[in-house]
């Protein structure tokens, strides 16, 4: 048997985006069985392009079964380190496809759920509610990250405006880790990781940032409003979403501590370039959400 070993480091969103790369890789060499090694194997469950999925660090007998004396190709490149990504020349999917030697099939990311799995998630989210669901994700990063990153998180001042506008007519579920603040009027979405990935399917309104939620929504064909600050939708986003940018203009030259990127994604306060905290136009976001 011929194998392609696809090693995917990084977070949930990067893994969801990588499903588009694996789809292209499978089309380029359909006889090869693709094996995924990832910190987030839940993203890859039920994926028809994937032969087996391994949790990173839990790879007993992997070398013996798939590498030693086997016909295998190993793809362990990190597209974040490629100059076409760093210099904002190509979308990350295109950069990654170039690295693995596959043509982008333009299908975009995909997530796969069985009907019974979706029914179970729907019951957890919807049962007992009398209002449609508004799904809100304003803070990115992992479970051990900082509570707030100005580089990609929606400012609390904007988020409160939006919640206050919609809270009487919608049941607002907020996606976030324990350290991240829960806005008054919102309900914490307490589901397992894979269940949260399916949550866009059961929502009427969706407001996201540059985090895994907007990748999941795209993978499920759920048009969403996405707010961008540091990163660019041309590189990490999708045309199908409504992409919104700050109306505040940078006022300070904060590149004194920057290396290959303009700022650290963790949101170092010394790199904040604006002269006000409320950098988005809340009314613009509300109007775009009304259109959904």
Spans of features found by a protein language model:
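Catalytic machinery of carbohydrate-active enzymes
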Residues: 1-292
């Amino acid at each position: 048997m011929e194998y392609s070993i696809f090693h995917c480091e990084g977070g949930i969103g990067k893994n969801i985006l990588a499903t588009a790369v694996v789809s292209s890789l499978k089309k380029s060499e359909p006889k090869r069985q693709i094996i995924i090694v990832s910190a987030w194997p839940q993203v890859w469950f039920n994926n028809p392009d994937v032969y087996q999925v391994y949790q990173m660090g839990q790879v007993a007998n992997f070398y013996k079964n798939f590498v030693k004396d086997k016909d295998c190709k190993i793809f362990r490149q990190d597209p974040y380190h490629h100059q076409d990504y760093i210099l904002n020349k190509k979308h990350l999917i295109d950069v990654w496809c170039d690295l693995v030697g596959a043509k982008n099939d333009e299908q975009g990311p995909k997530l796969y759920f069985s009907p019974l799995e979706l029914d179970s998630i729907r019951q957890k989210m919807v049962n007992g509610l009398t209002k449609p669901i508004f799904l809100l994700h304003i803070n990115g990063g992992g479970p051990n990250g900082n509570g707030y990153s100005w580089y990609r998180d929606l400012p609390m001042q904007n988020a409160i405006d939006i919640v206050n506008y919609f809270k009487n007519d919608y049941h607002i579920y907020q996606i976030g880790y324990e350290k991240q603040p829960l806005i008054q009027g919102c309900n914490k979405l307490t589901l397992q990781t894979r269940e949260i990935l399916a949550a866009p399917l059961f929502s009427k309104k969706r407001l996201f940032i540059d985090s895994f939620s907007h990748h999941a929504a795209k993978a499920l064909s759920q048009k969403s409003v996405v707010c961008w600050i540091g990163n660019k939708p041309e590189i990490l986003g999708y045309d199908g979403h409504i992409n919104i940018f700050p109306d505040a203009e940078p006022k300070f030259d904060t590149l004194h501590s920057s290396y290959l990127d303009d700022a650290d994604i963790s949101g170092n306060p010394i790199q904040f370039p604006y002269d006000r905290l409320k950098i988005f136009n809340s009314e613009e976001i509300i109007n775009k959400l009304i259109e959904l």
